[in-house]
Amino acid sequence: MTRYALITGASSGIGLALAEALARRGRSLILVARQRDQLESIAIELTQRFGVEVLFRACDLGEPLRLSGFLLELEEGERQIDLLVNCAGMGTSGPFLAQDWMTEQDLIEVNILALTRLCHALGNSMALQGGGQILNVASVAAFQPGPWMSTYYASKAYVLHFSEGLREELRSCGITVSVLCPGPTRTAFFGTAQMDTAKLERQQLMSPEEVA
């Protein structure tokens, strides 16, 4: 039976770089992100370049009902997933009290709740299969508070500590849990979070490929 690596946030940045790195190693992939057109183009390109099977699913992980539907599709499809890469994430910047609450809620849904739910659903599947791997993408932001990005920094601290705890819990099931904590990386994140990109350009940013 074909084994798949499932990658969220796979349409750009670190998620895309990890997808390419895994395809280069011959891994079959399931790519998840919001942008269907981008995913389709990426799937075609990776298949042509590396000769691997690449499936994709457009899904907004910030919407619990859509995530439920996606998880049901995975269960009914009976595809064996032995690697989960939780790379989807978002950020906001500015005074917390000035933020739009729905945007803050979306951040919590994507960065915390969707990641946790995917770990629970696919972790159970991996345990039944006899093992697997989970990679959760956090950030160096996980190690310190972040005024004017308080929710984002807190969400990454959650990912770090959740992953560290889960690593101990799932060790006996043959499941390896790792957490990636990259520094500032040249992705679309900063623009989406409405950060001062001119200031960031003066810093030494890593490329997504270097992180992957």
Language-model-detected regions and their locations in the chain:
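Conserved NAD(P)H cofactor-binding loop of Rossmann-fold oxidoreductase domains
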Residues: 87-92
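Residue(s) in the substrate-gating loop at a strand-loop-helix junction
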Residues: 139
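Substrate-binding pocket helix/loop in short-chain dehydrogenase/reductase
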Residues: 95-108
